[in-house]
Amino acid sequence: ALPAAAAALAGAGFVHRRVASLGQPGGIEMFLDGPGASPRDAVHVLLAGEKVRPDSPLPTPDVTEAEPADGFLLLGLEALVAMKLAAFRDKDRTHLRDLLELGLVDESWLGRVPQAVRGRLEELLRNPE
């Protein structure tokens, strides 16, 4: 899967890099928007159905959880929320708070997210800050 993605992205001018990450065996795969681009602005690639870290409570969503959107596939909101809850880094919590503030996620979601990450959503609902 990764070689095919690398070839497709290289054709669009992206440069493949693997960078080290704490707790991530083998590092993180990313594609920079040209040779001088920063990893902060890169496209980060996660393979479907695999755990990002060995201790992650859930694997990444399967490709079947994507929805058609104007000529491409877009990860569905439920799958995105579960992925953000599984990663639960500061930036993921920030994205989840944004979804809460916009009303796209609320208490009714407690029954929609996997049990393995439900406590994390409860934590954000109790204390969004």
Model features per residue range: what roles?
Residues A1-E129:
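Compositionally biased terminal segments of proteins
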